[in-house]
């Protein structure tokens, strides 16, 4: 609905902004912060790829390492020797610590670097060691950072073979989250949760966070410090924006694409990375997200006076109920399927009374739930297909 409204109102009066506009502002100094623990063979390649492909000159990369992780330090040292704008930061405490603790050490090193170089960064960007950064990302941040305090771009996981079901669930989730949920959240509530990667903070925002935490910007007790920061900045009246900005010219419009893949969506300035591919790793990561957002978030961020923002807070926190209910529903479904198989395979089997017969209200409720489920499936297929093509869209079912 929002897209249709903008197409009928905004884009009829104003042409879509071209990516060439991003080249007009002077390049402001930007700092990229990358925490790294046990990232041997990864962080060096990431920093080198960024240093050689970013379409921007006035930036520095600060990689946070640990004193008890010499292999990662060695990787970073090799890149630092080749690129003077890549810097190694060694945290005060041995690892592993929380991501927030590492980022606080990196931010402290950036402050010292600013004093010694006698200049100030205009923006501070979060990335992980696995990220592939879009060449135009810094130009987009440079264009917006004077007017916005938190800028978030989409995250689109890399594809794997279709048999990698665990990893592929991230494709489904992020396609919907950053294609639908967060844009609507920003439009209605003006609040954008940071994804922890592809996030740029203005100098105003970082200064406010440092003042709020007595010199410590990121909450080291939080398992989801990125989610936490979005609310802290909103409470301070800072402006937050989620940006879906495509880099499309006439040549790219004519390029051969996957079936039903959208030209503008598939050429979005975004963050690409591989997500966990094993069940145990994915459970550990998603458990951290659930605990941080649902339980720690409920304790830290109270309900507000805004009904709209409270609605999105409820959507964040309903996982405390829905995750358990979904698990119980799955057990019930397995039980019903086993009973159905038992009654079908053995003619003389005991036939249990069905819970689905004799109630018009129950049947109506089941059909209503079925309709809602189909609606959710269709939405997921649409948003996955827009970036990845129809094959991935159908696999999301």
Feature names for model-found ranges:
Residues 4-284:
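Internal catalytic domains of large membrane-associated glycosyltransferases
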Residues 1-15, 383-392:
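Transmembrane-cytosolic junction motif
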Residues 225-244, 282-294, 318-336:
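P-loop NTPase catalytic cores that bind/hydrolyze ATP
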Residues 25-35, 41-42, 307-329:
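Loop-to-transmembrane boundary segments
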Residues 125, 197, 291, 316-317:
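Interfacial transmembrane-helix starts/ends
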Residues 295-305, 309-312, 319, 343:
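Pan-eukaryotic secretory-pathway lumenal catalytic ectodomains of glycan-active enzymes
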Residues 268, 272, 276-301, 392-397:
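Membrane-proximal soluble regions of multi-pass membrane proteins
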Residues 318-397:
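Membrane-embedded multi-pass helical conduit in multi-pass membrane proteins
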